[in-house]
Each structure stands twice: as structure tokens, then as C-alpha cells.
Amino acid sequence: MAHFVVNNFTVETILSNIKSGSIAIPEMQRPFVWDSSKVRDLIDSLYKGFPVGYIITWQNPDVKLKDGTKSVGKMVLIDGQQRITAMAAAIVGQEVLDEHYKWKRISIAFNPLEEKFEVANNAILKSSKWISDIAPVLEPAFDTFSFVMDYCQKNEISDQMSQINNIINRLRSIQNISLGVITLDSTLDIDSVTEIFIRINSKGVVLSQADFAMSKISSNETYSGNITRKTIDYFCHLLESPEDLKDIKNSDTVFASLPEFDAIKWAATKSNPIYKTTYNDILRVAFTYKFKRGRLADLVSLLSGRDFETREFKIEIEEDSFKQLHEAVLQAVNQTNYERYLMIVRSTGIVRKSLIRSQNVLNFGYALYLALRERKIDSNEIEQIVRRWLALTILTGRYSSSPESSFDYDIKRFFSYDDPTEYLKLTEAGELSDAFWKVNLVQRLNTSVASSPYFNMFLVAQVKGHDRGFLSTQVDVESMLENRGDIHHLFPKNYLTKNGVPQSMYNQVANYVFLQQEINIKIR
């Protein structure tokens, strides 16, 4: 049995459905990643009748309302967002956001004499042979006859009036071009939809479950999902590009007037290279801590109103899930929470991002911190639990593979006890037993990879212990990590080589030590 249907819709119909909200396209409010030349090429392909690829939508499940009736689920666009945004920009004249959150127009010009498209520029604007912007030509009320008369007169080609008229009509017919739209069935779960996307997508672009979740969030304006998404997006962007605060404020005045904007604008005033979060990170942290689950597929189900017991989709579950997620996101972007967590991270000895190989170590640590605060655990105890858990997860590589399963398992176990410390103690006893220290760790030190988590943990421990660098009298390891330091062989390389020790032995991390650069130069 097929889990999808294929229909053909005209460009005009698709853009109309986007405008009416029948198809949700959340990316319209996010930076447009295509350059203008790609927009030109897309319009050129439509004009020439070349295929431009399928548009893929996912029919959201029908939701059971409180009165027992059902609301038909909205279609969410999961592939084709850039193409549709490009068509809306060129054909309808819709502005797009650039990477700095500034609105701009992409004007595609057309030369009827050469039947050629170009991105509008100053030379084109001055030329009578070019239509500097095709959007007005594609409007329903456009007067083709008057335009052709005027165009031919300006360019002294009255004998080509019939030909130019046909070309302009062909240009206007772009809106009638049919595109294939694949609609995935509402019964498919998010894992299946992800797999389908990966198999269909010729470019091999992996659409993550966070992408699905974010699309689901922003497409629901009824429960302010669009505000939740903007809170996440803008916060993460400001951490990376604080100089864009003013542009965001000017380009989205409605959001700038909301308390959510006040809650995130602090991110433009702080710079912290240790924990710069992406939308994936904030979404995972907020979901894990608030819902005590780790699989983002479950978040999509909850936001669709799924009752995991009855397997029905209920409006009250959908409403409550959006409300809880919004609250969780505000806690995750809260300045006090964020900075206090970073203080714990630094007090653990983690003073540089490179000391952690997996961002998910910090993500779970933050989710755990927020969840413990919500449980109203004593602040000193929270710090101890989080520090110990960070150390454990770095040493064991706990979130290096299958992080969602590990997140789900750990967050549920932590809060299945009246005292969350119990799960920490049990995990330490199992994962960091005498066998780990006497056998496993010793074997894992048999590596020459300087980014080894075990060597990194050694540096973390040195920072925690305020140790000075090797052969240093004043400068500590923390200062060298934050500024400039070198890795050197504890037992000199030349000495070991002369005594027959092979490279595979003398380059092991157990023979590495961190020291000042100038001392390293003198030793050489």
C-alpha cells in the first residue's frame, strides 16, 4: 500500500496555498540561503519547461477536538522550501531575509529579444531592452497589449510586435506550469518521513528530526509556535552574530515588541565560545528537561496532539504541548540560567570548547541543570550533580553515538528516584568502577590522538586543580588553554627514539603534557 499520493499543481496554485496557509512553509520567516543567480536559474528552467524537482509535503494527522469532532491536519512543506521561496520572491515580488536578517528584494530581469533572464543590476535598469523586474508583468491585471506597444516603440521594433507579444504571454504562463507535489500520508511517523526524505533527496541533504520539529512548531500560529521558533532562531543567531541585533529588531518589529525578544536580546552582549547553541541544541535541551523524553520524534507526536496510550490525536494534548515547550524554551534562553550553567561548566574545568568532543555532553548537562532547578533541588547539590555527570559523560563517551536514546534513558532514570543523586551514584558505580580505572582507561590511553577524551579529561582535571603548566613557575594550565600553550612529550621524543622506542609508543597520550609555548621552544 502506497503511503503517498502524487498530484500536479500549478505554480500559481502552490503559491496561493502557501499564502492562504493550506500548506505551511515556516522557512519564509528565516534567512534565504540561495544566492540570486540560483533564483534566476529556477525561473529560466520554468520558462523553458525544464523539470525543477518534486515538492514534498507531509499531511499532519487529523486532531480530535474537545467536542469529539476532528480538525483536518495541515500540510507541512518538508522539501522544496527554497524553491518556493525563490518563486515567491521572483514571481510575486515577496521580500526575503538575508543572512543578517535584513529584508531585501530579488528582482529577476528578462530580455524579450533574447529570451534571457538575469539578476537585475544598474546596467539592466538603464536598458530599454530589459524588463527590470518580471513580478509586475506576472500580475493578473497586467496590460500585455499596452506593454508590447510601448516596448516595441522604445526599441524601434514595431515589425516584431507579434513575436514580442507571444514571448510576453509565454513569460506570463510561467504561473501555469505544473509541478509535481508528493504528499506523504499522515499515518507515517517521523522516522519514516525522515527516511523517505533521505532516499528521495538527490543532493543527499539529511533533514534532521530537529528540522521536522521546528517546521511543526513554526507552522502552528494558533498556539504561538511561530513565536517559539523565532525565540530559538534569533537567540542562537545573536550568540553567533551579536551585531545583527539591530537588524532583527528592524526587520521583525512585531516580535521585537514581545517579551520573548526582551528575554533573548542579552545574547548580543555576551560572548562565550564554550557553549554556542544552535536551534537543534536549544530544542533538544528544552524538550528533554521539560518533557523528560529524549527522542525528538516524540516531540513532533506531542505537538500533533498524540495520546501515547490511546494513540489518538487530541487537541488538548497539542495545546498543552505547545504551552510547555514555549515555557521550556524561555527557561533555556534565560540569561540567569544560561550563565549559571556556564559557571558550573567552567568550575568543572571545561574552559575551552575543544575539551569536549560532543556538544551533546553540554546539551544534556544543561537539560539536567534546568530539570533539577525545576525540581527545586538545592543549588549546591545541583552544581555537584551536574559537574560529576559532565565528567562521567566525557570519560565514557556516553553521548557520542545514539544520543537520543541515551538522553531518553538518562533523563527518565534521573527523575524516577526521589533523590536524583541515586541514579548518579548507580551510574558512577557501574561505569567508573575499579575495572574502568585499572583496565579500560589504561587500554584507551594507548592512542596518539591529542583530542582523546581521556587526555582532555586530564587537562580538565588540571584546570580544576589549578595546576601550573609543566616546568612553569607561575602560569597555570587554565591560562594556557585560554590563550596559548603547547603539547609536549613528557619523556623527550629524541631520547626515546635513541633508545629504540617506536613512534607508536612515544606518541601515546600518556606521554603528553601541556606547557608554555616558550618553554617548549627551549626544550626543543
Tell me the role of every PLM-derived stretch.
Residues 506-524:
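Short Cys/His-centered divalent metal-binding micro-motifs
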